[in-house]
Amino acid sequence: MLRILQVIASLAPRYGGPSVACPALAKALVRQGASVTVFTTNVDGPGKHELPLGTPQKRDGVQYEYFDGWTWPAEYKFSPALARALFWRVAAFDVVHIYSMYIFSATAAAWACRRHGVPYLLHPHGTLDPYLRRRHALRKRAYEWLIERRNFRHAAAVLFNTPEERRLAEAWLNRIVGSADVPERAVVPVGVEEHWFAPADPAACANLLARFPELTGKQWVIFFGRLSFKKGLDVLARAFAEVARRNPQAHLVVAGPDTEGFGARLCTWLRQAQVLEKASFVGVLNEQQSRALLGAGAVFVLPSYSENFGQAVAEAMACGLPVVISDRVNLCSAVAQAGAGLVVPCESAATAAAIEQILRQPAQARAMGERGRRLVAGAARRAGRARRRAGRL
């Protein structure tokens, strides 16, 4: 039996894609006969999760172990306890799967693997996107030359979520590692859990309307995901303002964790555009509530400046919702080719026009939604095959 260790800084929902992808991949690998353990910390933004530290927890056949982490510096998630566990126990595993970069957990895991001769896979999860690398560029450049260059040179493989993410990382890999030393690169699609394809619970739908009665009888324009700088929330605010002025039935529904204080900024932008009363902020929803929201929506919108995969896009399509996404979401080619939605430049006028087109043509919207479901179902099957390949790397 293959013994796999996955190392991720945190599984808190506020951190988006990796916190969803890691457990999903772990469960898939267990179903294929592997033994999977996940090392992570209890860090959750400025605070900490109340989790059982030092006591393994078994879920879906996966063993999770939580270690105390520091909340400062917030982005680094320093954890001496995690480092000690990696040093003393990593040799018991056949391969280690390391999530993200520029972060303590990844650095400690790669170092421990090299020290004990254990092969490891690096999974940047979008951190090599040129748009994101421009943020804190000097700090990241120093970290790359001091630490990440060695981490990548000694990796058994580098994993990407989409072919587009791999393409965007090629120049960086060749420069920082050297074209002769670049490890194997594989695309391992994240996929969507089966429950997203299930019909929405009527009770969850009723509960949502009871909590937010202003949604009754409206066409829901849905943003579903982290309220983050890269999500294009300024574009969304301007685009929705244009739509709302011409369509009194349009109502913006914003769902997801506010990790960077962008909820207040979005409120300000909507207030300045005089459409704040046509928006509802529903916060973080559980699985059933999320399916109820997406299942009853008119259109899903994600005008991101950068998106290495777009987990929320895939989940919306699994629920049969047509999507409007920017051409910087790495799923954009698949969405356009399948006719599952509209792909537009990352600017407000084009986004508004696409939203209006879908709201005006319900038959076309339903057809897009069905094509999206088929696209995601097919991608889920391919993701399973890719995960099996990742287990053999």
Regions found by a protein language model. Name each.
Residues T40, E144-A206, E214-T216, V282:
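Donor nucleotide-sugar binding/catalytic pocket of nucleotide-sugar-dependent glycosyltransferases
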Residues N42-G45, V192-E193, F224, H251-R265, ...:
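Glycosyltransferase donor-sugar binding loop
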Residues A264-Q288:
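Nucleotide-activated donor-binding/catalytic signature segment of Leloir-type glycosyltransferases, i.e.
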